[in-house]
Swiss-Prot record:
The modification Phosphoserine is found at residues 70, 284, 313. The chain crosses the membrane at residues 124-144. This is Probable receptor-like protein kinase At3g17420. Residues 145-467 are cytoplasmic.
Length: 467
């Protein structure tokens, strides 16, 4: 048996014996299997890497939660014709040269709390010196341990804000960079949704008047966002006394903050695709740096919309007093909703009042309605914040009031774009509406008044006849 096997294996096939051919074949098969194994392993790793990497150029998508409808430019949501009449009356007063009282005349600028602007320089990256951790297209991927160390294990002393979304902590990274860590609530599904909304809204955008999103943490059930830290408070704190230890905002500082906010919104609405509707514009969401440059923050309610589209919501989100009437009434949302909210903030900065304050007399509870009544009665000096040591000039106040009134127009289609708002506030001209539009409204109001007068006369005649 052994000798027969030996003869078989030593049998020659050409120049090689059979056993040599078998050894060569086995070796070749081993090499092929090894090469295939290495190739498959490399390919698997490559796929896994691609699955966790979001290209920077990829447009954020949120279509599964956005219902788009075409815009009907012919429609309007005019539920307050008296407001339009009031705005028109104010414009006519300006054109006729009506003056404010002498108490608003310009005075020397003293005691300003607005520090001199520092020359703009290229700031070093706040992530400089941090260890390289996995990146997902943008920003920095922080570990839970990183943020625990930064916030002293999320101590109560580190809390700088909270709300229905979660808690915001002040922290310091290992490279000494101060940050604001937004820790979303661990509600099943909701934290992931809020996280995705905010990342898609601001993760890829860059503007000097938008608070910068530095990175994030996704670990277990934890969802956290890491923002640059603004140590100069927000507009609400400055307007309503929480920053009284630093003084009061001057008129110039207020306008500077509002112009910066307008430019940030113009960028979100007009410069990127899909456009971003913030949906929660209010004074507490406008942060400030040491030079009083505005930094718009909190994109937890933001919506991404395509061109010429609205969002229809079954649940109205936002802050009472700032929400646009058409959105509150019908759930119809677009960028003009932000314009209305911005107008409320501008009036808040002018008056120093909250949009809704039930501690005030009944006719003064709603700031927008009260202000329009005051303008109608030509009590312009009464609307200016009493805390302003140096009042704005006549032209400055007119410009700001007219801009705000256009922003809070009850007809959303007649509100200006935010780029126009920024130009209005920076311009030396009054932001009046086109003459043809004013003439049309004037004729419409006159016709309405004439019809009302005729109706009253008919009623009087009927009453006399009965007597």
């Amino acid at each position: 048996m052994t000798s027969q096997l030996k003869r078989t294996l030593t049998k020659r096939y050409g120049v090689l014996e059979l056993w040599e051919i078998i050894v060569i074949a086995l070796f070749a098969a081993f090499i092929v299997i090894l090469v295939l194994s290495v190739w498959l392993s490399f390919r698997k790793k490559s796929k896994r890497s691609n699955a966790t990497t979001l290209p920077v150029t990829q447009s954020p998508r949120f279509t599964e939660e956005i219902k788009e409808i075409s815009v009907d430019h012919g429609s309007s949501n005019n539920n307050g014709t008296s407001y339009q009449t009031l705005d028109e009356k104010f414009v006519e007063d300006i054109e006729n040269g009506d003056k404010f009282s002498g108490s608003l005349e310009k005075k020397p600028l003293v005691g300003s709390h607005l520090p001199p602007s520092t020359p703009s320089t290229t700031a070093p990256s706040p992530l400089l010196g941090l260890p390289e951790v996995s990146h997902i297209g943008w920003g920095h991927w922080f570990t839970l341990r990183d943020l625990q160390l930064a916030t002293n294990h999320f101590s109560k002393e580190s809390i700088i804000g909270d709300g229905g979304y979660g808690v915001v902590y002040h922290g310091t990274l290992t490279n000494k960079t101060p940050v604001a860590v937004k820790k979303l609530l661990n509600n099943p599904g909701q934290a992931d949704k809020d996280f995705r909304v905010e990342v898609e809204a601001i993760g890829h955008v860059r503007h000097k008047n938008l608070v910068r999103l530095l990175g994030y943490c996704v670990e277990g059930t934890h969802r956290m966002l890491v923002y640059e830290y603004m140590n100069n408070g927000n507009l609400e704190q400055w307007l309503h006394g929480d920053m009284i230890h630093k003084g009061h905002l001057t008129w110039e500082a207020r306008i500077k903050v509002l112009v910066g906010t307008a430019k940030a919104l113009a960028y979100l609405h007009e410069a990127i695709e899909p456009k971003v509707v913030h949906r929660d514009i209010k004074s507490s969401n406008i942060l400030m740096d040491d030079n009083f440059d505005a930094k718009l923050s909190d994109f937890g309610l933001a919506k991404l919309l395509g061109a010429d589209s609205n969002y229809v919501s079954t649940r109205v989100m936002g802050t009472f007093g700032y929400v646009a009437p058409e959105y509150a009434n019908s759930g119809l949302l677009n960028e003009k909703s932000d314009v209305y909210s911005y107008g409320v903030v501008l009036l808040e900065a002018i008056t120093g009042r909250y949009p809704v304050d039930y501690a005030r007399p009944k006719e003064e509870v709603h700031m927008v309605e009260w202000l329009k009544l005051m303008v109608q009665q030509k009590q312009f000096e009464e609307v200016v914040d009493k805390e302003l040591e140096i009042k704005p000039t006549t032209s400055e106040l007119k410009r700001a009031l007219l801009t705000a009134l256009r922003c809070v127009d009850p007809d959303a289609d007649k509100r200006p774009k935010m780029s126009q708002v920024a130009r209005m506030l920076e311009s030396d001209e009054y932001p009046v509406m086109p003459r043809e539009e004013r003439r049309r409204r004037r004729n419409q109001n006159a016709e309405t008044h004439r019809e009302s007068t005729d109706t009253n006369k008919d009623n009087d005649i009927t009453t006399d006849a009965k007597i």
